[in-house]
Amino acid sequence: MSRHQARKRFGQHFLTDDSVVEAIVRAIAPARGDRVVEIGPGLSALTQPLLRGLDHLTVVEIDRDLAARLRNAHAPGRLTVIEADALTVDFASLGERLRVVGNLPYNISSPLLFHLMAAADTVRDQHFMLQREVIDRMVAAPGSADYGRLSVMLQSRYRMDKLFDVPPEAFDPPPRVVSAVVRMVPLPADRLRPASEAALQAVVARAFAQRRKMLRRGLGDWAALVPWDALDIAPTARAEEISVEKFIRLTDALLQAGAVPA
């Protein structure tokens, strides 16, 4: 079979280091009966070892040439190929207790993470390889330089752990950045949740639009409607100092005041 040329428009960097593959598979720990979906299988570096531990695997591949290779290499009873952009896939329709894995295209990683949030109620866990700097932002604590919109939104929905770094030389072609692997486990149904996810997104986006501004200025005309003392938030605080819990309570207060549409 001819060698596949990585395509920049799809952000393709193929994992070639067997030791990294083994470490990722150990972290996932696939088992018979698991319902696993792999995003961006590429040249099957993860696909093959995953299949050894599974009855069946579903993959999402946008590259039609790679999708054809996958179909030709595996029996339909073992592998289902969804030839599509992962941003258009309704993951919630793929079953309950999904385990979603993959070496995500770095050029769409943040939009894809937000897209997957819509299916979090049907997901058991997620294991992804991403740029290290993105994962550092995902798991960042309030008060740190990496803490921002991505941190708040994802931490409101998942417990996340950065597992290990992956050097550029583990890929072909090597990316210009260090990568890392993250585990994401949806928080339970009884978690603190906003009355409206859309409202939380709106509040967090406005708060971090000018992250160095004091919150009372960053929120603009909403600031006058915030019960600062009741929320135990200093109006002079900056967005990067506000915990996820306080962002959720702030959002609910602004919803009750009619400032933010649900």
UniProtKB/Swiss-Prot annotation:
Keyword Secreted (UniProt): no
Molecular-function annotations in GO = 16S rRNA (adenine(1518)-N(6)/adenine(1519)-N(6))-dimethyltransferase activity; RNA binding
> Where, in this chain's numbering, is S-adenosyl-L-methionine bound?
H13, L15, G40, E61, D85, N103
From the record, what ranges are coiled-coil?
A: none
Q: What is its EC number?
A: 2.1.1.182
Gene3D superfamilies given in the database record: Ribosomal RNA adenine dimethylase-like, domain 2, Vaccinia Virus protein VP39
Summary of the function given for this chain in its UniProt record: Specifically dimethylates two adjacent adenosines (A1518 and A1519) in the loop of a conserved hairpin near the 3'-end of 16S rRNA in the 30S particle. May play a critical role in biogenesis of 30S subunits.
For this entry, the protein name equals Ribosomal RNA small subunit methyltransferase A
Q: Its gene?
A: rsmA
